[in-house]
Amino acid sequence: EPKHFAISLTGEPTLYPKLNELIKELHNRKYSTFVVSNGMEPGVLKNLEVPTQLYLSVDAPNKDLFEKIDRSVMKDGWDRLNESLKIINKLNDKTRTALRFTLIKGLNMQNPKEWAEKIDLAKPMFVEVKAYMHVGFSKQRLKMENMPTHSEVKEFSKEILKHSDYKIIDEHERSRVVLLMKEDFDGRVMTF
């Protein structure tokens, strides 16, 4: 029987009008909840029934790259994302929070200081720095060459950390992901 529910798979979960009720019901049944958002609905995040873990996906460190990569239909998408980062900061004492940086070789692996500024704004418990993977619909827009190697992800993570008080805590080479935290803690479980 499942114990953990990921609320993220297709589309943006914060657009689901009964998200709070879903999270409450899952918690009543003693399940953990894992919500992954693109940050375009900060008002929903602000009033969200607190999940067990809240992830915010970040694909760009600045407005120009955000507009190029995310191509949000919302004209104020960049502002919405930054507002959501501030909300993550306020939720840190209520739930596990994480930023997920997806690195795309040849596109957004630049401006490490600006990536660090996103960490500083949200101050999440975890930052996952991961490689773009050439799968699904993304294959229509990007190439196999846009997938950074694990060593490239790790090296770029180190560049980000020159501007941050976080540090590399863990990594998983096959998944091409590096975990950043301020400090590790007992009981942390590697889920990748």
Stretches found by the model and what they are:
Residues 10-12, 38-40, 59-61, 102-104, ...:
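Active-site beta-loop-alpha junctions enriched in small/polar residues
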Residues 46-65, 124-133:
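Non-cysteine beta-strand/loop elements that form the S-adenosyl-L-methionine
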Residues 89-90, 94, 107-192:
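Auxiliary Fe-S-binding modules of radical SAM enzymes
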Residues 1-51, 86-89:
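Conserved Radical SAM active-site core
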